[in-house]
Amino acid sequence: MSMSDDDRDIDIESDEDGDSDTGLGSSRHTNTANFTQAEKRAHHNALERRRRDHIKESFTNLREAVPTLKGEKASRAQILKKTTECIQTMRRKISENQKDIEEIKRQNNIIAKQIQALESSNGDQFSEFLSDEEVGSEEADDEDLDQDFSRRNKKMKTFHA
């Protein structure tokens, strides 16, 4: 029994659904047992070309994701080296930011306790401080409030330095 041309089609569909470099993630595999040696070689070459194209595209995507390499020509070794450096820098920044967040949370807790202590010890005096005259005044100078906030903000920033 002879095979038709349709039966001999070689599956070289892209491996977009699978995330495998070897092409094993594909759900369709071609049985090459009935192919000639030349057809098997052509099939193997097509698979290898697809694998190389996938690797090349992955390196291009990686190069474009690294700020110091974006738009630059770079060897694969340079791409890997700069990517590693970028990841290490990002990890360091994340760690520093997490420490800053913890410090700010700690400062917020201290300030909240101070506010609570002031409110409980000076309940009557606090109410007098916020009299209708001061709170209700439409002509309160917003710049003074902004400057006061700015000074407090600067103090907080230098507090842990």
Curated annotation (Swiss-Prot):
Composition bias type Basic and acidic residues, residue spans: 45-57
Region Disordered, annotated ranges: 1-59, 122-161
Ranges annotated as biased composition (Basic residues): 152-161
PROSITE patterns: BHLH
Pfam families registered for this protein in UniProt: HLH
Swiss-Prot/TrEMBL keywords: Activator, DNA-binding, Nucleus, Phosphoprotein, Repressor, Transcription, Transcription regulation
Compositional bias annotation for Acidic residues: 1-20, 130-147
A molecular function GO annotation: DNA-binding transcription factor activity
UniProt main location, coarse: nucleus
Annotated bHLH domain residues: 39-90
Any GO BP: negative regulation of transcription by RNA polymerase II
Tissue expression remark: Embryo, especially in central nervous system.
InterPro entries registered for this protein in UniProt: bHLH_dom, HLH_DNA-bd_sf
Role: Transcription regulator. Forms a sequence-specific DNA-binding protein complex with MYC or MAD which recognizes the core sequence 5'-CAC[GA]TG-3'. The MYC-MAX complex is a transcriptional activator, whereas the MAD-MAX complex is a repressor.
The family this protein is said to belong to: Belongs to the MAX family.
Subunit structure and binding partners: Efficient DNA binding requires dimerization with another bHLH protein. Binds DNA as a heterodimer with MYC or MAD.
The protein's name: Protein max
Organism per entry: Drosophila melanogaster (Fruit fly)
Gene: Max
